Amino acid sequence: MIRNSANGIFFLILTALFFSCDKIDAPYAEVNVSSIDTLQFPSPSFAINPDEPRRVLIEDFTGHTCGNCPTAAIQLENLIASSGGKVIGVAIHAGETFAAPAPPTYPEDYRTEVGDAIDAQFGITSAGQPNGMVNRIKTGNVYYTIPNAWSNRVNALLNNTPQADAQIGIKAYYDEEKERLIAYVHAGFLTSLSGNFRLAAYAIEDSVVGDQKWYNQGLPNDHDENYVFNHTLRGNVSSLWGEDIAINPQAGSVHRKVWTLKLKPEWKPKHMKVVAFVYNRDNFEIIQPGEAKPEL
């Protein structure tokens, strides 16, 4: 990644020009905007914050028959809680070994098409679980790392480069009539960058109750039948790998998308949220993530 310094006055002028408008410009990718009642679900304004802090996305690859995975989930929760909103988590149920249904004790299948695609691309579950990625940054020949190393990687990112290169703005709604999420997503670049950048968005659900194997808890057969899954990846709101938004973006440029996703009957709107992020498609590195709960 190459940063190009920008004159402060020039940046302020760009900010005023690009971010003062209150209306999202058409066209929108992948969505027939006429299908959205913009009076009921209005598009948001977006103003860039020059002091936007860097945030980090941790993707935790888990499974309901992985007895060590709940410990990794606790580590993720602790990092989120201690970060002051700078760490965002996504729990991805993937792989045949620990995420496949195993009835009658573990009948559910929390796997998703997008989760399987991510797993195949980065080879996570073939290396064992629990494992995860921190901003999809490659170290050596691999992208994944064990949960005990997440904290050091997060701290290095937040301490070494505390100011973000981009800002994510999300406004999400639940359209009860059509049983769908509507997600307006903005990506604004605070610095000029080299690379080919994409914007992607996922649907996440908290408070999913189900069966989980959990070692060393004194449970019969290590089985917790009322385990609470948080940050559960439910699907992609954008296309599978997101949408191209910019090649070599300049400081002050802003890009806007709107997507919809129909919810499955078992998904609870009050527990849903949208996680979106901008990433460099040349190396998969996530530049900045964000998250928002839908307005019900």
Question: Whereabouts are the PLM-identified features?
Answer:
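Bacterial Sec-dependent N-terminal signal peptides
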Residues: 1-5, 12, 16-53
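Generic alpha-helix initiation/capping and coil-helix boundary signal
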Residues: 8-9, 269
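Generic detector of ordered secondary-structure context
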Residues: 13, 50-53, 58, 124, ...
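Disulfide-rich extracellular modules and peptides
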Residues: 23, 68-71, 134
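Short, conserved sequence motifs used for protein processing/export or organelle targeting and
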Residues: 91, 98-296
